[in-house]
C-alpha cells in the first residue's frame, strides 16, 4: 500500500509494538554522525527518531523497541532522561546485522503483529488503516510505499538491438513506488530468522515471495 500527503487526525484505538532500526552508522549524514548517531540528528528542537516515536505514540503505540549499535549509549542516555508517555526497550546489536539480523534479536520479545520502521522516515498516514489492510489481506509482511512522480527534463530515446530508434518521448513524466522503510510484520517472521545472521529486509521479503 502507499501513503499520500493528506493530514490525518489522531485517533488511538490500537496499541501495536513498534520496532525501530536505530543501529546504523549514518554514513550519508557524515560528518554530523561523527558526533551524533543518526537517530539523534535534530529536526527542529528534537531528534528525528523522537518525532517518529511521538507520532506513533499519538496514533497507535505505547511500546517501542530500539535496535541499537553505533553510539548506542548516547541513544539510551537521551531516552532515559526525557519525559515520555511510552515505554522504550533497547535491543543491543553487537555487530552490524542488517534489518533482518537485527530482528532476530527480538525472538521471545514480540509475540503479536508489530510495526517495523527505519529511524529516519516520518510517515503521515492513517496507521490503523494500514494495519487493518494488513490483517484483511492476511499478509505476513505489508510494505508501505510512496508514489513518486519524476519529470525527465530531456527527450528520451529508446534504441533497438541494431541501433535504430524505436520510440521518442519528449520530457516524459515517470511514476513509480518507492519503499518508505515502514512495514507491518507478523511475529512469525522473527521466529523464522536465523540467529545473528546478517540479512537485509528486502532479502527476507524475496524469500517469502519465492516460497509463495
Annotated model-derived regions:
Residues 1-10, 171:
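Short beta->alpha transition motifs characteristic of CBS
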Residues 11-75:
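N-terminal glycine-rich phosphate-binding loop and ensuing alpha1 helix
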Residues 22, 68, 118, 145-146:
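Short beta-strand/turn micro-motifs composed of small residues
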Residues 46-119, 124, 129, 159, ...:
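Conserved N-terminal catalytic core of the sugar/cofactor nucleotidyltransferase
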Residues 61, 111, 138-139, 212:
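Short, high-confidence coil segments that cap the C-terminus of an alpha-helix
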Residues 114-115, 122, 128-135, 148-151, ...:
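Catalytic-core segments of class I nucleotidyltransferases/pyrophosphorylases
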Residues 137-147:
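A short, conserved acidic/glycine-rich loop-to-beta-strand motif
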Residues 158-164:
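Short acidic-glycine loop/turn motifs at beta-strand connectors
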Amino acid at each position: 500500500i502507499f501513503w499520500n500527503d493528506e493530514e490525518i487526525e489522531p485517533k488511538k484505538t490500537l496499541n501495536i509494538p513498534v520496532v525501530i532500526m536505530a543501529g546504523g552508522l549514518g554514513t550519508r549524514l557524515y560528518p554530523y554522525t561523527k558526533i551524533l548517531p543518526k537517530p539523534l540528528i535534530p529536526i527542529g528542537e528534537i531528534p528525528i527518531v523522537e518525532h517518529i516515536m511521538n507520532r506513533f505514540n499519538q496514533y497507535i503505540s505505547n511500546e517501542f523497541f530500539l535496535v541499537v549499535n553505533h553510539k548506542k549509549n548516547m541513544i539510551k542516555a537521551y531516552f532515559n532522561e526525557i519525559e515520555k508517555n511510552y515505554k522504550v526497550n533497547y535491543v543491543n546489536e553487537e555487530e552490524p546485522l542488517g534489518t533482518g539480523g537485527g530482528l532476530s534479536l527480538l525472538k521471545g520479545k514480540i509475540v503479536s503483529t508489530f510495526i517495523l520502521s527505519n529511524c529516519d522516515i516520518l510517515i503521515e498516514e492513517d496507521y490503523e488503516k494500514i494495519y487493518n489492510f494488513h490483517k484483511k489481506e492476511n499478509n505476513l509482511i505489508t510494505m508501505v510505499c510512496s508514489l513518486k512522480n519524476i519529470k525527465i527534463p530531456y527527450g528520451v530515446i529508446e534504441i533497438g538491438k541494431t541501433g535504430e530508434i524505436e520510440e521518442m518521448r519528449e520530457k516524459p513524466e515517470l511514476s513509480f513506488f518507492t519503499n518508505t522503510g515502514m512495514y507491518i510484520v507478523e511475529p512469525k517472521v522473527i521466529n523464522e530468522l536465523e540467529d545473528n545472521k546478517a540479512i537485509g529486509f528486502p532479502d527476507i521479503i524475496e524469500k517469502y515471495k519465492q516460497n509463495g
